[in-house]
Structure formats: structure tokens, C-alpha cells
């Protein structure tokens, strides 16, 4: 807009070519709207406007009307003010949104803080209950440890006095009467016929032509070849036959290690045997067959037990493992 206003002024101030001679008479008289003579437009070498033309009417009108330029400036100022107001409103809207976001975050933080406070209160209550429970348990443990210590002290005193050992042994026997009475490892019969059978077996071994003989018999328990009849008593078999029937018992006995002469360990522990009917050992007392023994079987004490050691033969040992009170005194000394 300023370029449009300045361009007529520049065009009015442009230099015109120099005109020789006086052209005031040649030009027709023209009157300006303001009443001035047209001679003022003539160019003379002696006039003040030598070489310059008079300002054009457009330039005069522009230069003499400051109200139009002022109105244009006012319009520009109004547009800038409107733009500034719009920017301020946008800035205020952004600030309002940021404030709302900050307020929402503040409320969220307050809710989280309230939840954390509730959890802390619950944990404090739980810790208080746990402390009470721990103190109660500690008190009970202290009481139990005191009682146990007192019981151990009393037991040590009784052990030092060597009292109640026989009672303890009797109580142990009473706790497992079924295993000792109902489930024996074997049924032993002491008989004097054992010596005669042993001599006969030694003679048969010396005269036998077969070098190898199986230690066990066949699995047929109804008619075993090595079964013998013995009399349970202190006299010989011939004398037992002459006595009445109620003076002694006639039994069918077998040698140690034969079929069904010992109780099956697997059956005794679990009540079942993987071999079933083919097992060489007895599955119960009803299947046990008596074994003939030496007359002095289990009459002398085992030297390993008397020395305080463990006998490696176990229940198969031919010597006695139970000690009498006199033997216990000898063992302690």
C-alpha cells in the first residue's frame, strides 16, 4: 500500500527534458480547481522550479489528505490487535489444559498415597499380630525345652543309678509280643538225635560217590527226603518210644537251610513276596518246618555279644544273644 502511495509522488518529481523558449504564451490558459493560474506550471530557466515539473494532482491529493493514511494505519493496528488477542486466547487455553492435567495427576497421586497409607496400616496390624504369636511360641518353646531338660536330667540320674533296665527290657518285649511269639525266624528243636543224624550224614558223605550235593532239597514239601523223626526230650529216641505218649512229642524235623525252614524276610517286611509259591522260605508260621538242633543249641552265650560287639550271624547264630543279669554285670565290669 505504501508503494502505491509513493509511486505517484516519484512520478511527479521526475526530471523533464529542458525546453528552450518561453511556452507560457503557446499554452492555453488552464485554471486549477483551487483558482491558481496555469502559469505556475511553466518551466523557465529563471523560475525556482527549473528542470522540475509541478506536482501532479494525484500527488497533491495524496500529500494533502492525511486522513486516508491514518485510516489505513488504524486498520493495520486493529488487525494486529485482533491477532494478539487470538494468540493470548490460545495461550490461555493451553495453560488451562496444562492446569487440568496437573490437577488430574495430583488427584491420582493423592489416591495412590491413600492406598499406600491403608496398606501400611494393614501391615502394621499384621506385624503386631505376628509379634504376639512369636512371643507366644517362644514362651511355649521355653516351657517345652525346660521340661525336656528336666526329663533328660532325671533320665541321666536314673541311668547313673542303673535302675529300671529290666523294666525297660520288659516294656520292649511287651511292645512287640506278636513279632517275637507269632513271627519267629525258625522253629528249633533240640534233640539228642541230632548227634546220630550228624554221624550218619558224615558217613554218607564219606561213602558217597557224587562230589557235589545240593544243600537244599526239592521244592516238594509233602515228601522231603531228608526229613527225620525226633523226640522232644532229654532221652534217646528208643527210650522215648517206650514212654507214654504224653511224656514227649514226636516231631518231623529237618536240617537247617532246607525248604521252608526259615521265615521270608520280604514277606515279613511288606506282607508280599515277588517269588510267590516258588519262594524257598516260609510265608507265615503255618509254613515253618522245625529244624533239628544240637542238644546244647542256644545254651551258651555268644562271645561276640558278651564282648559288646554285634554278632554277624544274627538269628542264625547257634549261641545265645540274650544276657542274664549276671552276664550283664560281667559285661559292665
From Swiss-Prot:
Entry coiled-coil feature ranges: 110-138
Paired cysteines (S-S): none
Pfam families for this protein: zf-CCCH
Annotated signal sequence range: none
Alphabetic keyword roster: Coiled coil, DNA-binding, Metal-binding, Repeat, Zinc, Zinc-finger
Segments passing through the bilayer: none
GO molecular function: DNA binding; mRNA binding; zinc ion binding
Protein's name according to its UniProt entry: Zinc finger CCCH domain-containing protein 9
Zinc fingers, C3H1-type class: 258-286, 296-324
Biased composition (Low complexity): 199-210, 217-227
Biased segments, Basic and acidic residues type: 232-241
Annotated segments matching region Disordered: 198-249
Domain of life: Eukaryota
PANTHER family: CCCH ZINC FINGER/TIS11-RELATED, ZINC FINGER CCCH DOMAIN-CONTAINING PROTEIN 9
Amino acid at each position: 500500500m505504501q508503494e502505491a502511495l509513493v509511486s505517484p509522488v516519484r512520478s511527479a518529481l521526475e526530471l523533464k527534458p529542458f525546453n528552450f523558449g518561453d511556452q507560457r504564451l503557446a499554452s492555453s490558459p488552464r485554471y486549477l480547481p483551487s483558482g491558481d493560474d496555469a502559469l505556475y506550471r511553466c518551466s523557465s530557466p529563471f523560475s525556482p522550479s527549473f528542470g522540475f515539473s509541478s506536482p501532479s494532482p494525484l500527488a497533491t491529493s495524496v500529500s494533502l489528505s492525511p486522513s486516508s493514511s491514518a485510516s489505513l494505519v488504524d486498520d493495520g493496528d486493529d488487525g494486529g490487535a485482533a491477532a494478539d488477542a487470538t494468540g493470548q486466547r490460545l495461550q490461555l487455553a493451553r495453560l488451562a489444559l496444562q492446569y487440568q492435567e496437573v490437577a488430574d495427576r495430583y488427584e491420582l497421586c493423592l489416591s495412590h498415597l491413600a492406598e499406600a497409607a491403608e496398606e501400611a496400616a494393614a501391615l502394621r496390624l499384621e506385624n503386631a499380630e505376628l509379634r504376639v504369636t512369636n512371643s507366644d511360641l517362644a514362651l511355649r518353646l521355653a516351657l517345652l525345652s525346660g521340661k525336656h531338660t528336666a526329663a533328660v536330667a532325671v533320665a541321666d540320674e536314673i541311668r547313673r543309678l542303673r535302675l529300671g533296665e529290666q523294666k525297660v527290657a520288659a516294656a520292649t518285649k511287651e511292645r512287640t509280643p506278636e513279632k517275637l511269639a507269632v513271627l519267629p525266624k525258625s522253629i528249633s528243636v533240640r534233640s539228642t538225635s541230632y548227634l546220630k543224624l550228624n554221624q550218619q550224614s558224615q558217613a554218607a558223605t564219606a561213602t558217597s560217590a557224587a562230589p557235589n550235593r545240593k544243600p537244599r532239597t526239592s521244592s516238594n514239601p509233602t515228601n522231603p527226603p531228608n526229613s527225620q523223626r525226633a523226640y522232644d526230650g532229654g532221652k534217646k529216641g528208643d527210650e522215648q518210644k517206650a514212654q507214654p505218649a504224653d511224656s514227649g512229642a514226636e516231631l518231623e524235623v529237618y536240617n537247617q537251610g532246607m525248604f521252608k525252614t526259615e521265615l521270608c524276610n520280604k514277606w515279613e517286611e511288606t506282607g508280599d513276596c515277588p517269588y510267590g509259591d516258588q519262594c524257598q522260605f516260609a510265608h507265615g508260621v503255618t509254613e515253618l518246618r522245625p529244624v533239628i538242633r544240637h542238644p546244647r543249641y542256644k545254651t551258651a552265650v555268644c562271645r561276640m555279644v558278651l564282648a559288646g560287639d554285634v554278632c554277624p550271624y544274627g538269628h542264625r547264630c547257634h549261641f545265645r544273644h540274650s544276657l542274664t543279669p549276671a552276664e550283664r554285670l560281667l559285661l559292665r565290669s
